Amino acid sequence: RSGAVAQGLSAINTYIGNEQDPADYARMVSNDLMGITRDDLAYDTGRHVDDSVHLFEEWGLPIWKTLADGTRVDGARWPNEGGKLLVEGGTPVRSGKWQIMINGESYKWIVAEAAKKAIGMDNIQERVFIVKLVNDKNKENTVSGAVGFSVREDQVYVYTAKAILLVAGGCVNIFRPRSVGEGQGRAWYPVWNAGSTYTMAAEAGAELTLMENRFVPARFKDGYGPVGAWFLLFKATATNAFGEVYMDRNKEMLNDYPPYGQAAVPASCLRNHLMLKEMKEGRGPMYMDTVTALANLRKTLTPKEVKHLEAEAWEDFLDMCVGQCGIWVGENIEPEKKNSELMPTEPYLLGSHSGCCGIWVSGPTDVGAPTSEEHAEADKVPSHLPSGWNWGYRGMTTVNGLFTAGDGVGASGHKFSSGSHAEGRLAAKAMVQYCIDNKDFTPELDTSVDDLVSELYQPVRTYLEHKDYSTAIDVNPNYITPRMLQFRLQKIMDEYVAGVATYYQTNAQMMAVAEEKLEMLKEDAKKMRAKDLHELLRAWENYHRILTAEAHMKHIQFREESRYPGFYYRTDYNLVDEENWHCFVNSVYDKNTKEWTVFKRAHKDLVDKSKLFK
């Protein structure tokens, strides 16, 4: 799927370097995600991620450097001015403790070129939309293949495989977006991420984790432009309409959520929590104070450096969010003269940014992770699932042969592009080992090819059978268009499952209504039509979104607390309950009965978290 790196990036947000170590990284990840993450996964990513960044630079990604005299130069200049590669001891330009600046408008192309050379184009099939994983006929709890279709020609692909890497991104557009009408389709995360990772894994029998988690980024309003460089590199502050820095004005609120609000950098959701107070009490709109930030930088820079800095302010968007430049140009905004509005977005589900929903995977075996399940509700964990945090292959789900990385790996956020790539490398090596260990296994699909093709094309048949009933093909009592079905899903989630309509608030009664409406939506979804390949794509994206949305709702329903204030609030349990809910909420889906089983798994710290507060 075209993903988070496709439009480019202006920074790599996870690079450990010599200043920190993987344990520091695991601490940061844990605190930002309110204490419920797997240290084994974060630590493992932390000790491998720099290798991925070094590979990116070797393949041609321009990374900014700080020269020996302290001068900062971008990726185009340093090779001619005495700079070094990172692997040779070069010093990156850090915008924050973990982030390094890049010229990344071609980031994905550069990494993809390396993949093409390694694999060979003869072994790559593009524009094939995978809709379903297929379990094995003879070996229980094992994946053996997948089915998909070309979005360019009338062709279905059925694969068999011993090992499969499922990395189709996170989930966007299950909530009604802030950008509607002519802005439809503009989102912060890529709209092509349709929850396929989570739905296909769940239908294959994989255990999900922390699906209640979501990310609600505060971004430049309407364009969803990135704020990281402004906060970290340009040292800008966010204010209310009266110029007050809301993080200062409301800082006492952070003490309501110890210890996560008391770290040097409070958890992301809590920063939203403070912003939402301003909005609810009528002190909006919120602004990024670009004018003051650039004015302060001018005091210490030469006119030439100032001009370069202003260019970088624009390039920050051109590198990764061109639409935000359109907003600035269209609204006559010059950042040195006029501040820009900020706004928290609609919710997104992901496992690689400041979010940690995803799939429960096997971790490393050498960092002291639990190998058994010991807590008061351990008997409620389904008996067929493995105990502990590792069961043989790094990155493998609870389904044999099914691996994931990036947004797919739950309980370990803040991987971003580099960490996701590192997880992919770890999973790929484990997949090779799995295939070697299972060399005598011959995968056999548990569903016939004819049945798979029939299910895949059902929306097309629905259209062909009923299209002549009415004179307007979009208005027909026998089917619904994918576009309209998506609007229904977004309305349900927005109004009942803590979307922007309710300031991210929900309760048990609202979710009971959502549950009922989602059941009816699933019935209606069987009548989706597809008049062409594009609508067939949209129809299957909707099937994936609906099940992912249901998982999200079921997990919030089960977790009787508000673990992520600022991202969502349960008004009937509006607290962070460390005594009863400092745990993972996990689930499995039975594709035959269509029922979810949701349960707790114990949390355990593997690194000392107190260092954050010393």
Segments and roles (model prediction):
Residues 1-27, 228-230:
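Conserved N-terminal glycine-rich FAD pyrophosphate-binding loop of Rossmann-like flavoproteins
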Residues 15-63, 203-210:
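Conserved FAD-binding subdomain of flavin-dependent enzymes
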Residues 59-144, 210-413, 495-614:
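Mobile, glycine/GP-rich and aromatic-enriched active-site lid/loop segments adjacent to catalytic centers
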Residues 153-163:
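Core beta-strand elements of the Rossmann-like FAD/NAD(P) dinucleotide-binding domain
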Residues 161-163, 167-168, 405-406:
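Short, well-ordered coil/turn residues at beta-beta hairpins
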Residues 166-225, 417-430:
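Glycine-rich loop(s) and the adjacent beta-strand/alpha-helix scaffold that form part
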Residues 436-531:
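Long, amphipathic alpha-helical stalk/connector segments used for oligomerization, subunit docking
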